[in-house]
């Protein structure tokens, strides 16, 4: 009976062994073991130069977070999001860097209809996140190479739907000048001609003005709600970029006025290029050094001609030469051969 029972259980054991890789794959995709908490965060050397300036877009507009990385040895890649109007921690979409399948999607609650894509290239990888932006989903999105405890942040994309400025009550409302491209240090928008603003009350004696990009279907009727008075989480990044137009942006503390420092003296305009000026200076320096050396050589010749004695000078004639040897008899042939 024992042998028969063991024979009956062999097919079941064989089936379990064959299905183990599938179970492991299913468990890794459905119940991920990776977490969104990164113990050690590092930034790439070209992190600031490759990160574009913050962009101001309209609510409901579709945006894509493109992440492009070169060939690496990290086991996972991710898109890490920190939302401007949320006090919670960061959420993260984690993908396997080898196969490209999803390990964890912490953005599914904030972005339920978002789609992601992963492409493996010969020299690198491209992974992206596409969603419709809103006030709740505006924030900072970072491209990260990571493992279970460490992460290397490669790029940062800042998506904004509203931009807060302050103006004095007795001054007209300022209009910020938005850029047209993502390069540089100026906040930009792909549609700056649709810029609108609305009043959101007072803040520390200043008039709160919120600028937004109007919708194409209802630019004059629709207005977003005024946010809280507290500065958002994106302010630490936004304040690094320029916003021309004589506008005061909100700050967590009153601004500190620095003393005026004297301006450096202006350069004298010679009408010549700097390379021509350097060439003339080098030419004059060379000839000045050559002239000094030549004068020193002439002085040496003149001084030595009068003060330095030469061989044979100042002696009686003939005493300066060696006398020829004298022989009593001419040497024979045998002596010559020696």
Curated annotation (Swiss-Prot):
Effect of mutating residue 334 to R: In strain: Isolate 2J, Isolate 10J, Isolate 45J, Isolate 29C, Isolate 27C, Isolate 18M, Isolate 33J and Isolate 14
Q: Which Pfam families match?
A: UL141 (PF16758)
Q: Which Gene3D superfamilies match?
A: 2.60.40.3790
User: Origin, by domain of life?
Assistant: Viruses
Q: What happens when you mutate residue 28 to F? A: In strain: Isolate 84
Q: Which GO terms describe its biological process?
A: symbiont-mediated perturbation of host natural killer cell mediated immune response
Could you state one GO cellular component term attached to this entry? host cell endoplasmic reticulum membrane
The residues the entry assigns to the signal sequence are: 1-25
Q: Which residues lie on this side of the membrane: Extracellular?
A: 37-278
Q: Which residues are glycosylated?
A: 117, 132, 147
**Keywords assigned:** Glycoprotein, Host endoplasmic reticulum, Host membrane, Host-virus interaction, Membrane, Modulation of host NK-cell activity by virus, Signal, Transmembrane, Transmembrane helix, Viral immunoevasion
Location of this chain's protein in the cell? Host endoplasmic reticulum membrane
Q: Does the keyword Signal apply?
A: yes
Coiled-coil regions, chain positions:
none
Write out the transmembrane intervals.
Answer: 279-299
The record ties this protein, via SUPFAM superfamilies, to:
Immunoglobulin (SSF48726)
What's its job?
A: Evasion of NK cell killing. Blocks surface expression of PVR which is a ligand for NK cell-activating receptors. Binds human PVR in the endoplasmic reticulum and prevents its maturation and transport to the cell surface. Targets also the natural killer cell activating ligand NECTIN2 for proteasome-mediated degradation. Additionally promotes intracellular retention of TNFRSF10A/TRAIL-R1 and TNFRSF10B/TRAIL-R2 and thus down-regulates their cell surface expression.
Q: How does it assemble?
A: Interacts with human PVR. Interacts with human TNFRSF10A and TNFRSF10B. Forms a homodimer that engages two TNFRSF10B monomers.
**What's the protein name?**
Protein UL141
* Taxon lineage: Viruses, Duplodnaviria, Heunggongvirae, Peploviricota, Herviviricetes
Name of the gene encoding the protein in the UniProt record: UL141
